[in-house]
Design a protein with these regions (language model features):
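Bacterial N-terminal signal peptides that target proteins for export
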Residues: 1-11
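A broadly tuned, weak detector of single residues within folded domains
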Residues: 6-8, 21, 48, 111
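Bacterial N-terminal signal peptides
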Residues: 10-20
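C-terminal region of N-terminal signal peptides and the immediate post-cleavage residues
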Residues: 19-37
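Short, surface-exposed binding/anchoring microloops in extracellular/periplasmic proteins
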Residues: 33-76
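Short beta-strand segments
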Residues: 34, 127-133
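Ser/Thr-rich low-complexity repeats and stalk/linker segments
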Residues: 62-124, 133-137
Length: 138
């Protein structure tokens, strides 16, 4: 029993320490001019098991791709942690900031904190951001 507790504690620390260092990040800009930010909240539809994450993306050169991964560790959700990902292949890259929705299907999230990781690939270059968000059930 002590070994299990120790393994759980070490797992949480392994995730929490590096995540804690990055939790203040709210906006990321690639060196080439692509930028992305994550909405503070994500909406979870409990009946459809889908999580909707909203982004603000600015890029140039045509069409880009946004990929989102959301991890919800224990104790926010049951053990083991919940992880899901989704993408939007139709990000408009015209130099203006656009709202971009990404839906994650098939993962069951609980209300509370979760960690979002976003990568945008665009003709104007990549952008990356990581941030703690709040999952709300509607």
């Amino acid at each position: 029993m002590k070994r299990i507790r120790l393994l759980i504690l070490l797992s949480v620390l392994a995730v929490a320490l590096p995540v804690g260092l990055l939790s203040g990040a709210a906006k990321a800009t690639g060196s080439s001019g692509t930028s992305v930010s994550i909405s503070q909240t994500a909406d979870f539809n409990a009946f459809g098991t889908q999580l909707d994450v909203n982004l603000l993306v600015r890029c140039t050169g045509g069409i880009g791709l946004a990929n989102v991964t959301v991890n919800q560790p224990h104790p926010e959700t049951g053990f083991p942690a919940t992880t899901g990902d989704g993408f939007n292949p139709d990000v408009v890259c015209d130099g203006r900031t656009h709202s971009v929705g990404v839906t994650i299907l098939g993962a069951v999230y609980d209300p509370g904190r979760a960690y979002a990781i976003v990568d945008v690939t665009a003709p104007s270059g990549p952008a990356h951001i990581e941030k703690w968000i709040t999952v709300k059930v509607n």
